[in-house]
Amino acid sequence: MEWPTDRTSGTAMAVWRHAAEAALVDITQDREKITPAIENFKQSLAACENFRTEYRNIIEEFVTIMASASNEQALDMAQAGIDALHSLMIYRLDSHTAVPAKDAFVVTSSYEKLRTVHIQGTQEIDSSDFQLPLVNPANIKEELYGHGACAQVDAWQQYGVLETSASVYAKTALVSRSLPSVAHRKKFCLLGCTSELGPARSLLLIPGAEVLGVCRGGEKYTSLLQYVEARSPVTTRLTVPENGADILTQGPEIAQWILDQTKSEDTLVLMPLAYADGEMNVRLCVAMDLIMQRITRQRRKAIVYQYSTPTQVLVLPPMAASAAQNRLGKRPTWEKFTSSLSLGNWLQPSLPESNNDYCILNGIATAQGPNYILAKTLQMWRCMIAYYRDDLCVSAPFAPICRTRSVVAYKSIAIVLEGMHHFEPMLAFDASVASSLMCAIMMSQIQVVNRPVPDMDENPFTLFWDGSAHGGVWTCPYTLESISTVNWMLGRTMYPKGYIPEAALAKEKTPEEKTKRTMAAIKALEEMEQSQFGKPMPECVRERLEFM
């Protein structure tokens, strides 16, 4: 997967322009509002002299147009953006032949077949006793189970780093004894299976789980295979291409390999997880998108599941927007003084005083670069089209900002993450902790396969609200961009590496607190059911009350 040979600095801008122009076709609603907005956007692109430094505001204009347009127009913009990238990229068949990327994926069966390796687990585990673990944020070498894991999820919810829906999903999976049956007849296809944030290692602990993993060969590939042999149940299997496969150079072969490993009756959970730095990330995401497009046209029972990033331009739920505004009013006076001292560059309110039809939050940090945002926006577009037009099951919850190896490799960014939690409820997660949390959320979300027909009257951006663990970005009173410098100073001088606020960790309840809470729940239940006090309570009911 390559950029065109005549690539210029305007190539990325052409994608945004193409997507915006799609909304001009057959405008039937809000003509007086949408047309001027698009013209202003095109003028911003034309006047842009350095896209890398100006892209943050330009992309906010674009998302504002999408959120304000009719739902069909927003989807037209998403489809136009996808088409622009598919047409833009080229795929090299050999050293002498290159074709448009979209054409290379039409007949994938004509390519050389990838050889397959199956790795089976070795552990004898009773599936009826299995519980999904949650990595302990206070000590990542430990795992939490059952009610202990739920207590930590409650702490995160109360702190403000995840939504109620995410809390419910996670706790449901963490106390469930039936996850092996949830995984039955599903195949989890992970494009980038060695991703730190990805769910591979958690999934491979579930008895009966079947994972199709795609990644390049190397140390991480070998480590994952060894993990399966050491920790996975005997009924769990990891299937990978022999010696790995490169998504950038073997996309059509990978698409055909996945089709060959699955049947039409299988429920295939497709996850794009691979990441690369810089412009390579755009090429990688286009390759994954074309793989997914090829597969979903043949496997109609596929579930598209991806992790969205809160560090892009977002449309916020009203409750989150209200929480951010409330937090802004409670911040200390010195922060307002600091903002004035910096001429408004530091500590900017996350939400403008007047907005459009929806609350728009610009979560972009300029240091990420425009290629990162273009790649993540492509994935957002794909989810919208897959759900609202292709009639597929789609979940795309937001995942928190994490200390992944690729992030902390940049020393300045690593320091910023250490000071981030000063602005409550912002919180950077260790990658293994976030991975286990997001896997729990996923295992609950994929159970809801008989979803209602998508409501075309709802804004397409609402698709991304369900089950989100945004790490506090949604409800922080300031934009991520405007607190980065202050975060760096605080991370450099005040907070030790890996520091976690006490309020974001589960508090162990005393025996008296546990008894008081359980008895109160029992009394409420007895009054509701008009039962007679003293009757023996079934153990399953008692466990549920303790969970509550």
Regions found by a protein language model. Name each.
Residues 305-539, 544-547:
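Long, contiguous domain-sized segments
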Residues 143, 147-191:
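Acidic/polar, low-complexity linker and loop regions
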Residues 171-230:
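Secondary-structure-rich domain cores
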Residues 207-213, 229-235, 264, 289-306, ...:
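Structural alpha-beta junctions
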Residues 1-66:
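Non-catalytic protein-protein interaction scaffold segments in large eukaryotic complex-forming proteins
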